Amino acid sequence: MSNKNVNVRKSQEITFCLLAGILMFMAMMVAGRAEAGVALGATRVIYPAGQKQEQLAVTNNDENSTYLIQSWVENADGVKDGRFIVTPPLFAMKGKKENTLRILDATNNQLPQDRESLFWMNVKAIPSMDKSKLTENTLQLAIISRIKLYYRPAKLALPPDQAAEKLRFRRSANSLTLINPTPYYLTVTELNAGTRVLENALVPPMGESTVKLPSDAGSNITYRTINDYGALTPKMTGVME
């Protein structure tokens, strides 16, 4: 290999390392800012049918920063949806303060009443900047917190705490299908086939979700789910169809 090619390759490696370092630094800065900045009071919102409103707490843990808070709801496909209204939709939040978002039902009973419906609650935190300190190289990062919002009809056929144990499984050569016969969304985590860890899955009510299955995966299926409070349920053994 010529010296010219060696130098080009070294230059490319140095550039790649620099870019990787910059991206890692930015990720650390964002993570630190998110931890010190704005936090939500829940990991999911359950909206019972017939309720006038549901509340979500928002806290600014950063004593020295003011944030502009913007909130909205999206449907399951990630498109803004007016069937739930968030108020206030936009407000300024000073350091060490807490505010409450009110989520209002504007669905007019048009959603299915035999199962849950999935939406996404979005809260964007935009940090304020001192204009006197701004330069051409200033990078302003807005952080969006996105959590599930479940619309839950009244009088569903099964209590929510019994749904996880009803999950069933169907295995093929290279995939595992999770079958949910209940009216609730099931967030499945710590899914294992023998000693192989499989990907997490969100299984819709009265529906299915499929995950990849390694060729050397064992036959014993175990899993846990996340309940209404964001906590893990006890480990369960999968029942095959």
UniProtKB/Swiss-Prot annotation:
Top-level division of the source organism's lineage: Bacteria
Phenotypic consequence of residue 210 to A: In strain: Clinical isolate 149 and O2:K1:H+ / MT78
Any one GO BP annotation for this protein: chaperone-mediated protein folding
UniProt similarity note: Belongs to the periplasmic pilus chaperone family.
Primary localisation category: periplasm
The species this protein was found in: Escherichia coli (strain K12)
Any one GO molecular function term: protein folding chaperone
GO CC terms of this entry: outer membrane-bounded periplasmic space
Gene from which this protein is expressed: fimC
Signal peptide as annotated in the record: 1-36
Record keywords: Chaperone, Fimbrium biogenesis, Immunoglobulin domain, Periplasm, Signal
Name this protein carries in UniProt: Chaperone protein FimC
Compartments, as annotated in UniProt: Periplasm
